[in-house]
Amino acid sequence: MKEAELNRDMARYCTDNQCVSLQPQGLGPKSAALMAPRTLRHVQVILALMVVTVIFSLLALFVVASQPWRPEWNKEPPSLLLRGSNNSGHDNHSQFVRETEMQVAIQRLRDYEENSSSCHKEVQILKYQMDNVSSLVQLLGSHLEDVNADILQTKDVLKESGALALETQALRSSLEVASADIHSLRGDLEKANAMTSQTRGLLKSSTENTSAELHVLGRGLEEAQSEIQALRGSLQSANDLSSQTQGFLQHSMDNISAQIQTVRDGMERAGEKMNSLKKELETLTAQTQKANGHLEQTDAQIQGLKAELKSTSSLNSRIEVVNGQMKDASRELQTLRRDLSDVSALKSNVQMLQSNLQRAKTEMQTLKADLQATKALTAKIQGEQNRLGALQEAVAAQKQEQKTQNQVLQLIAQNWKYFNGNFYYFSRDKKPWREAEKFCTSQGAHLASVTSQEEQAFLVQTTSSGDHWIGLTDQGTEGIWRWVDGTPFNNAQSKGFWGKNQPDNWRHRNGEREDCVHVRQQWNDMACGSSYPWVCKKSTGWSAARVG
C-alpha cells in the first residue's frame, strides 16, 4: 500500500494499480476514531527512528572530526637502527635518513589528505541526510497536527458516547421505577375496587335495614302515642275518681290525696315531655316508677281501710286497673327507650357509612388522578423506549457499517480489487479448477461469475496477462452451463463472451472432457484438471466504496 490519506469526510487507499475511497454513512467521525490511535503510533515510531538515526550520524561525525592526524614519530625507519651500531657511518648515512623521513612525512600527509577528503564526503552525506530528516520531521509534524485534530474529534465522539450511555442507563432506571410504580398502582387500584364494591354492598344492605327499622320504629311510635293518649284518658278518669273519693277520705286519706296529686302532676309532665322523646322519656320513666311506688302504697292503705271503706271498693278496683295500666306504660316506655337507643346507634352507623362512602369517593378521585398520571407516565416511558430503540438501531447500524469498512480495508490489504459492488481476487498461483474453487470458498467467496458486459470487460482487462479460471462449469450436466455461486446463467447474454467455435468440449489424450471455463480475452472451455490462475468474487453490498 503506497498511500493512505484520512480526513473527516473520506478515506482514500491506494495500491500499485488501484485506489479506493471510503465515504462512511451516518456518524462519520466515529469511523475515523478507530484509525486515529494506530496512525499516531505509526507516526511516533517513525519519528523516534529518525531521531535515533540523526543522533547516531552526529555522533559518528563528531568522533571522526575529533581525531586529528598524528605522525607516528615512535616508528623509526630501519636505517636509524644502524645508528648505534655503526658510529663511524653517521655522516655517510645522515643524508639518507633525512630523505627517508621526508618520504615518510609525505606519505602521511597523503594519507591525511585522503582521510580529510573521505571525512568531507561523509560530512556532505550527513548534511544531505540532515536535510532529508528535517523535511521528514516537518512532514511528520503536519501529519501529527492532523492526527491530533482527529484525536480531539475522537475524544468528543467518545464523550458523546459516554453521555449517551449515561442517558440510556438513566432511562433504564426510570423505566424500572415506573414499572414498579405501575405494578403498585395496579394493586392499589384493585384493592380500591374491591373496597368500593364491599362498601357499596354494605351501604345497600345497611340502607335497606335502616329503612326497615325506621319503618318499624315509626309504627312503634304511633302505637306508643296512641297508648299514651289512652293513658292520659285513664289518668283523667283516675283523677276524677280521686276527686270523688277525696270527700269521703278527707280525714284519713290526706296522704293518699297528696300522692294522687303527685301522680297527676307526674303524668301531666310525662304527657308534656312525650313530644321530645330523647330527654322527657327518662324523666317520665322516673316519675312513672315513683307513681308506681305511690300507687303500691296507696293500694296497701286501701287494703288496710277496706273494712272501713266498703263504699270505696269500686274505687280500689279502678285504682288497681290504673296501676296495671301504669305498669304496662312503664314497660312500653322502657321498650321505646331501647328502640330510641337502637335508632341512635343506627344513625351513628349511617353517618359512619356516609363518611366511609365520602372517603371512598375521595380515594376513587385520587386513584383516577393517579391512573391518569400513570397513563401519562406510561406514554412518556413508551416514547423513551421508542427513542432508546431508535438509538440502539443507530448504534447497531454504525457497528455494522464499521464492520463492513474493516472487511473492505482488510480485503484491499489482501490485494482484492473492487468493481461495481463486488471484490475480486486475481491469484498468481496455479491450481486445478476444483482446488481454485475450494480456495475461494475458504475466503468466503466463489469463482467469479459474469453477469454484464462491464464485468466481462473488467475481467478481460485485469486477466490480459494470462488465462484465469472463472466459476462457469457444466461438469455433471453436460451442455447445461451453470455458475458455481448459484447465479442464473444467461445463455443469450453470454454468447458474445465465448471465443470462436467455443465451447467445443474437446477430448484430451487422457480422455478428460473440457467442462470448466477460463478467460483471457474471451471464454474458453478447458479440462477441469488443468492448472491456471483463478479469479474469486465476493459480494459485500458496500455501496459507499468507489474505485478511484
From Swiss-Prot:
Keyword Glycoprotein: yes
Predominant localisation class: membrane
Sugar-bearing residue positions: 86, 92, 115, 132, 209, 255
Subcellular location: Membrane
Membrane topology: Single-pass type II membrane protein
Swiss-Prot/TrEMBL GO biological process terms: endocytosis; NK T cell activation
Protein keywords: Disulfide bond, Endocytosis, Glycoprotein, Lectin, Membrane, Receptor, Signal-anchor, Transmembrane, Transmembrane helix
GO molecular-function terms, A-Z: galactose binding; glycolipid binding
Xref: PROSITE patterns: C_TYPE_LECTIN_1, C_TYPE_LECTIN_2
Spans through the membrane: 43-69
Disulfide bond sites: 440-536, 516-528
PANTHER family per the UniProt record, alphabetical: MANNOSE, PHOSPHOLIPASE, LECTIN RECEPTOR RELATED
Functional description taken from the UniProt entry: Receptor with an affinity for galactose and fucose. Could be involved in endocytosis.
Protein name from the UniProt record: C-type lectin domain family 4 member F
Gene name of the record: Clec4f
